[in-house]
Amino acid sequence: MANTPHGGVLKDLLSRDQPIRGELLKESETLASILLSERQLCDLELILSGGFSPLEGFMNEKDYNGVVNDLRLADGALFSMPITLDVSQEDIDELKLKAGGRYTLRDFRDDSPLAIITVDDIYRPDKAVEAKKVFRGDPEHPAVKYLYNTAKEFYVGGKIQAINKLNHYDYVGLRYTPAELRQEFGKLGWNKVVAFQTRNPMHRAHRELTVRAARSRQANVLIHPVVGLTKPGDIDHFTRVRVYQALLPRYPNGMALLGLLPLAMRMGGDREAMWHAIIRKNYGATHFIVGRDHAGPGKNSKGEEFYGPYDAQKLVEKYKDELGIEVVPFQMMTYLPDSDEYMPKDEVPEGTKTLDISGTELRKRLKFGLPIPEWFSYPEVVKVLRESHPPRAKQGFTIFLTGHYNSGKDAIARALQVSLNQQAGRTTTLLLGETVRSELSAELGFSREDRHKNVQRIAFVAAELTRAGSAVIAAPIAPHEAGRKEARETVEQGGNFFLVHVNTPLEYCEATDRKGRFAAAKRGEIKGFTGVDDEYEVPSNADLVVDASQTQVRTIVHQIILLLESQGFFGN
């Protein structure tokens, strides 16, 4: 029998409101609409399905303040994470948002109506208090950054009525709602279920850990990975789900089940662990594995952890009776080569030989095509990871050349394209500054804002091509540090980026300017010309600095090729 939902009743709004769906759908077309962001969609999906029970909507001010300050909703029920719908003053004015009003919540992807919210209140949160009490206040914490840089200034609280489920087109058969998963447990005759939360690929150690946890409690295993929003830089959920599917047959027959959780993680450490436990209880689990530094975002720029290693376990353990789900502490597993088995580190006899591979080492082995031993991960899992993360020799990259007009960027770019074509194995795309201006950014001028937009567009195109395995050579002036930084971040989300500063002196660029652009700018005929009436900000983090006034193009191209070769882009 599945565990009792948090609060005693599963708030499955989809089932509750199905009888009046037609009326709600008709009404939704007459109401002002709030277009939900990706994170808000994740939250709404779990409100609608009952994953966030006992919530029936986004938190009003009383519930929000109770959760932030005391880990409790206004009625006293435990809840550790604020679930809020943020809006701007512009939204309030444009949509005429007010208490008592009804508004349609729509999916930003296809504008489909998902629900109607009846507003309880609109309030301005104290973000400093939320940042401090919920996420401990470190400005580098990703949730704190989100609060200050992305979340809007007001929150809207109110109960929701369901119209439609969110549309998903991937792994549909694995996307159980809490009610569906509870029904599945009933079909299988499962009474005790150990839920395992993960946002990473699983290897042999994870399999051994979960099997031990289940056997010691005579229970079954729910592998319940997050496929909503996780930590930037995490392996994409498509790859991870293929990994979990490959791993599943390695469990004893009938022991494990895979289900996907559309959660937007906050990386909130101890509070997030309690939240995860509540969610798994709503999905019917009786036990929940809480790991070391559970849902922590890692380290800040000073090398300090945001949370203590066992803070999460301590908080969930403290409230375990009220939560109504048993905590299973995550045991760090290690491999014993002499006996070919995994064992919890704290149980290994002194002097016994052990082997481990860190996450950093695994990424290195994937990046350079190095062997990954079978004692660490199953061959079928490694195969999936290698397909999604090919070695450097098969990865795409972007060479981003920046410098003054007439610095030699275009000549270097054209010569580099020929040299890379000679290497074979990749398509090569050239994005010259003037070509991009005429084909992609014809309507843009040369203001700081328009220059930034131009670089953003180049970065977007480069990122897509790089992700697909191409070599991209971009050669804009890109005079501003912020634009170049954003370009690097955009491309590096799916590939490799190298910034080459073509540091040819401004005087040389002007003296050899056969088209007379510098002279025209000085006469005032061209506005916003870099080096005349717009400053060029020297890159602080270039991967290579060259000077076309002192070095031949052939030599510069060779330097770039050597840089790529040193990073493994042309094989062993």
Swiss-Prot record:
One of its GO terms (molecular function) is adenylylsulfate kinase activity. 3'-phosphoadenylyl sulfate binds at E434, T435, V436, R437, R451, I477, A478, K515. Its main location: cytoplasm. Residues 395-572 are annotated as: Allosteric regulation domain. One of its GO terms (biological process) is hydrogen sulfide biosynthetic process. It is found in: Cytoplasm. CDD domains: APSK, ATPS. It is an enzyme of class 2 (transferase). Residues 170-394 are annotated as: Catalytic. The record marks H203, H206 as: Transition state stabilizer. The adenylyl-sulfate kinase (APS kinase) is non-functional. It is involved in allosteric regulation by PAPS. PAPS binding induces a large rotational rearrangement of domains lowering the substrate affinity of the enzyme. In the N-terminal section; belongs to the sulfate adenylyltransferase family. Homohexamer. Dimer of trimers. This is Sulfate adenylyltransferase. The gene is MET3.
